[in-house]
A protein has these predicted regions:
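Residues in intrinsically disordered, low-complexity segments of regulatory proteins
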Residues: 4, 89, 98, 165, ...
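Non-transmembrane, amphipathic alpha-helical segments
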Residues: 19, 23-26, 30, 38, ...
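Immediate post-signal-peptide N-terminus of mature secreted/exported proteins
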Residues: 16-77
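Charged heptad-repeat coiled-coil "stalk" segments of single-pass membrane proteins
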Residues: 57-138
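Long, hydrophobic, amphipathic alpha-helical segments used as structural scaffolds
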Residues: 39-42, 46, 107, 114, ...
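Sec-dependent bacterial lipoprotein signal peptides
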Residues: 1-16
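C-terminal amphipathic alpha-helix
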Residues: 116-178
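Short amphipathic alpha-helical segments
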Residues: 14, 25, 32, 171-178
Length: 178
């Protein structure tokens, strides 16, 4: 009977896990998701889309304003300018390698903290402080990466149709009969 109680207590204590386990798991999951979003964005071709936008922007800069082409300047160029600025902002914020390294480092830190907590190497207060520090470092980064990736995916969804549209516009610029 005594052994049965020991086994029951062992399972009850084991089922409890360690302090802040759920929060650590959530932070680890969110960090991994942000890293996957970032890697997926680059594998889906954001760099080639940006190169196309740069090409269209450089062509647009050569066009001289005149009344014949005023609608293009008022409408088409504004759309081009918006897409180009948003995409440029993405590449100016930080490189893929920079964001990946920050997220990967954060992921390593969370895993190390989980290991220390699981092994009982830290007391509950130290775990709480370390977890809060990780949250302070990672949550703004995760938020920025996820929102930026979502915005870039939205721009990329429109890219193919806009790329074709702008190419036709350039082709017809000098020769309206095309």
């Amino acid at each position: 009977m005594r052994n049965l109680w020991k086994i029951a207590i062992f399972f009850i204590v084991g089922a409890c896990g360690f302090p802040y386990e759920a929060e650590m798991n959530q932070l680890e999951s969110d960090t991994q998701e942000a890293l996957s979003n970032l890697q997926g964005l680059y594998s889906s071709g954001i760099e080639s889309d940006y190169a196309d936008l740069e090409r269209h922007a450089s062509i647009a800069r050569t066009k001289i304003f005149d009344s014949i082409h005023e609608p293009y300047f008022r409408n088409e160029f504004e759309v081009l300018k918006y897409h180009y600025r948003q995409t440029s902002r993405w590449f100016e914020l930080q490189s893929q390698a920079g964001w990946e390294s920050e997220l990967s480092y954060g992921l390593e830190q969370i895993k190390a903290l989980k290991h220390d907590a699981e092994q009982g190497l830290m007391d509950e207060e130290a775990i709480r402080v370390a977890l809060e520090n990780e949250k302070v470092a990672l949550i703004p980064l995760i938020s920025e990466v996820n929102s930026s990736c979502a915005a870039m995916r939205e721009l990329m969804a429109e890219h193919d149709s806009l790329d074709s549209h702008w190419q036709v516009m350039w082709d017809r610029w000098e020769n309206p009969n095309l």
